[in-house]
């Protein structure tokens, strides 16, 4: 997709899989830049600076960001693409799949009409419940180009039968009215998670409608301490730590799913509220340091 006379601009928090793929472009001396997270003013400034010297300008970002569950400003990106014809959008929406969008097609596709310069990647390995990737192109020509020249297509194999069966079963749910009742149920649990976290005065970094909760703990030492403490209480979740996030932006990454009960959510958050002050004391840190590192208002 990206030619030698194109330029690439990465959001600083775009998924590592995209950043890794871009390393192949660097080997071809393709110009690659990184801008601060969701800073469309910086994006527009770089478009203006690059547009006279490059054929296409690619902006690569996530639809829903994997660490803190926040969103790309999709509608604003579409407006920017309307304004600058050279701008092409490459968005990874795997974390927006199923729980959002019409028929569970994802966060990005739930934001309006498909933009003619949008290249969308998503996948079946998260909320969809099976395995495999999805690539959506603006026209048949681009589709045929990738299908017939991409190493990933040329050298990959077909889905194993059991994965294909799970994919077909999930697709039938997505194509039925059932998907909307499942999405609604998921949202009630996300809302409950956000509400209880606030009631317990936990440092919830984004009060997001996405099912990725992120409770900031600051230092990596505090994060590792919290994981050990919570495992001892029977709770397991991801720790977001450097280099996935900035060094002092360690956090407890808590992906919710529909099978979690309200009691599960309440028990988890209550235990975090109990253990966090002790973990902070152990690492000679404090809640005020968490608020400082994440630029939160107490």
Walk through the language-model features, giving the residues of each.
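Conserved PLP-anchoring active-site segment centered on the Schiff-base-forming lysine
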Residues: 1-16
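Short, glycine/polar-rich helix-capping loops at beta-to-alpha or helix-loop-helix junctions
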Residues: 12-22, 142, 248
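Active-site phosphate-binding strand-loop segment of PLP-dependent enzymes
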Residues: 30-90
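Short beta-strand
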Residues: 57, 156-157, 203-208
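Active-site PLP attachment segment
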Residues: 109-145
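A short glycine-threonine-serine/GTX helix/turn-capping micro-motif
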Residues: 150-159
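Structural motif of enzymes handling amino- and sulfur-group chemistry
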Residues: 158-179, 185, 189, 198
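Conserved PLP-binding catalytic core of the aspartate aminotransferase-like
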Residues: 180-194, 200-233, 244, 248-252, ...
């Amino acid at each position: 997709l990206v030619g030698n006379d194109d330029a690439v601009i990465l959001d600083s928090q775009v998924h590592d899989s995209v950043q890794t793929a871009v390393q192949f472009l660097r080997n071809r001396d393709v110009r690659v830049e990184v801008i601060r997270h969701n800073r469309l003013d910086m994006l527009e400034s770089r478009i203006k600076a690059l547009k006279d010297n490059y054929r296409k300008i690619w902006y690569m970002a996530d639809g829903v960001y994997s660490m803190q569950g926040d969103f790309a400003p999709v509608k604003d990106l579409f407006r920017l693409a309307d304004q600058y014809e050279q701008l092409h959008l490459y968005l990874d929406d795997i974390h927006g799949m199923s729980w959002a969008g019409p028929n569970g097609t994802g966060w990005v596709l739930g934001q309006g009409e498909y933009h003619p310069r949008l290249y969308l990647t998503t996948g079946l390995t998260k909320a969809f419940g099976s395995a495999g990737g999805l690539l959506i192109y603006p026209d048949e020509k681009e589709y045929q180009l990738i299908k017939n020249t991409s190493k990933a297509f040329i050298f990959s194999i077909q889905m194993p039968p059991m994965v294909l069966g799970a994919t077909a079963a999930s697709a039938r749910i997505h194509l039925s009215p059932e998907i909307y009742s499942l999405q609604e149920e998921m949202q009630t649990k996300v809302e409950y998670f956000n509400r209880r976290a606030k009631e317990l005065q936990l440092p919830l970094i984004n009060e997001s409608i996405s099912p990725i909760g992120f409770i900031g703990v600051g230092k990596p030492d505090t994060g590792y301490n919290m994981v050990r403490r919570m495992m001892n209480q029977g709770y397991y979740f991801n720790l977001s730590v450097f280099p996935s996030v900035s060094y002092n932006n360690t956090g407890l990454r808590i992906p919710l799913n529909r099978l979690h009960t309200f009691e599960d959510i309440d028990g988890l958050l209550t235990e975090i509220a109990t253990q966090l002050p002790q973990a902070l004391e152990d690492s000679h840190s404090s809640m005020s340091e968490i608020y400082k590192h994440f630029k939160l208002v107490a």
